[in-house]
Amino acid sequence: QIIQASAGMLPYVSNQPLRLSPSRVSEFENCPQLYKYRVIDQLPQPPSLDAERGTLVHTVLHDLFENAPTDRTPQSAIELLPSRWQAQMVEKPELMEMVTNEKEWFDRAESLLRTYFTLEDPQSFEATHRELHLENDFSEEIYLHGYVDRLDVAPTGEVRIVDYKTGKAPKPGWEEKALFQLRVYALLYFKTHNVLPRLLQLIYLGDGKVVKSTPTLSDLAATEKVLKRVASDIFASIEKDYWPPKPSRLCDWCYFKTICPAHNS
């Protein structure tokens, strides 16, 4: 399918602060051309079934903590799936046609939820914040923000930042790249509350693994340095209108491959 920009599409407004988030940083680092299509050109994309399943599981895990601790069980989580999926389809009616085998769809979501209960016991703690929006005016030119799946504050004050992933954990040696997202959240929390989070935790439901890290102030300083470098690179790309593609194995899953200059002479 050939994608064309709509004539009514909003242009990038250069006199507004650059909005940065972990996902936007990752997009630009992986492929500036993809960043341009999504952020600058604002080209529409159809929903991804994997992403929508992730949204469904995230919603159920969010709502699970509305229950009393004794009712935070695998069965009560699974019972939330149909109603949350209906709400998701109301928001995106096109999902109704995309999911051709609803039983298989629910079975996979149920499997991810059952895996969650092998990694944590949600009856044993209270989630202080869910879907917490952290933001900071990084500078006059940069607005940094992100949404934390869950943030727990212990009675003794220690802070744990948790992110659910419905995919598999990164291979050994690639954990640092995965943890960058949570280090950005830790930096945002530190800038807002002057408290250094005690633990960063990525929960991978695809293979039942957990990646943990204890951040330090030097970690946050290094993260801030990366953010400023990426922002500087984005501003340079905007000024030059230069968005070089970075061909990789990810291209086969990219919706914009048909219009990407790396794949079209």
Which sequence ranges carry the predicted segments?
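Generic recognition of stable, solvent-exposed alpha-helical segments in well-folded globular domains
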Residues: L20-S23, P32, E52-T59, E104, ...
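Mg2+/Mn2+-dependent nuclease catalytic core
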Residues: L132-E224
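Short, compositionally biased low-complexity segments
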Residues: E27-Y35, E52-L56, T73-P93, V195-L205
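Metal-dependent nuclease catalytic regions and adjoining charged, substrate-binding loops involved
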Residues: Q1-I3, A7-L10, R19, Q75, ...
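Nuclease catalytic cores
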Residues: V25-S26, N30-T70, F106-R114, A127-L132
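An N-terminal structural lobe/cap that precedes and organizes the functional/catalytic core
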Residues: N15-Q16, L20, K36
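Short acidic (Asp/Glu) and glycine-rich catalytic loops that position anionic groups and cofactors
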Residues: L34-D41, H58-L61, Q88-E91, V162-T166, ...
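A non-catalytic, helix-rich entry segment at domain boundaries
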Residues: V60-R130, D137
